[in-house]
């Protein structure tokens, strides 16, 4: 019987799931919008909501808890310094999930998970390597 089993396994080991969601949390906080499969988005949402609540409460111990969960100090800094003040008057519901059709290749249901009242300029910021251009004078 499947009583009391709340979370999806997503066909991964526990360590893989934990690492994947840590990376996804960091990516969502960095870009404020990511595209993923619908089940992953549904599993990610409560993790991110709890992290934003930690950020709203503030304090060194809660900052360290967020670092332990996310493993990305720069994004924890953004969480506590930028996102937490933005949502100080909102009681939960910091993210939304929008269905985004089906993926070509395996027909997996896709979704966009994003912060409510997100900063549109944050998407794509510092993503991947940048090619250096040499100026010919």
UniProtKB/Swiss-Prot annotation:
GO terms for molecular function: structural constituent of ribosome. Keywords: Ribonucleoprotein, Ribosomal protein. It comes from the Bacteria. Disulfide bonds: none annotated. InterPro entries: Ribosomal_bL17 (IPR000456), Ribosomal_bL17_CS (IPR047859), Ribosomal_bL17_sf (IPR036373). GO terms for biological process: translation. One of its GO terms (cellular component) is cytosolic large ribosomal subunit. The keyword Manganese does not apply. It holds the Pfam family Ribosomal_L17. Gene3D superfamilies: Ribosomal protein L17 (3.90.1030.10). Belongs to the bacterial ribosomal protein bL17 family. HAMAP family: Ribosomal_bL17. NCBIfam families: L17. Part of the 50S ribosomal subunit. Contacts protein L32. This is Large ribosomal subunit protein bL17. The gene is rplQ.
């Amino acid at each position: 019987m499947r009583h009391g089993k709340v979370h999806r396994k997503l066909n991964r080991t526990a360590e893989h799931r934990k690492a994947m969601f840590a990376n996804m949390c960091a990516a969502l906080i960095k870009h404020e919008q990511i595209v993923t499969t619908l089940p992953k988005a549904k599993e990610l949402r409560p993790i991110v909501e709890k992290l934003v609540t930690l950020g709203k409460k503030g304090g060194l111990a809660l900052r360290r808890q967020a670092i332990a969960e996310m493993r990305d100090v720069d994004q924890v800094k953004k969480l506590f310094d930028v996102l937490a003040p933005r949502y100080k008057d909102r009681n939960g519901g910091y993210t939304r999930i929008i269905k985004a059709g089906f993926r070509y290749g395996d027909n997996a249901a896709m979704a966009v998970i994003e912060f409510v009242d997100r900063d549109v300029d944050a998407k794509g910021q510092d993503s991947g390597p940048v090619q250096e251009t040499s100026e010919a004078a």
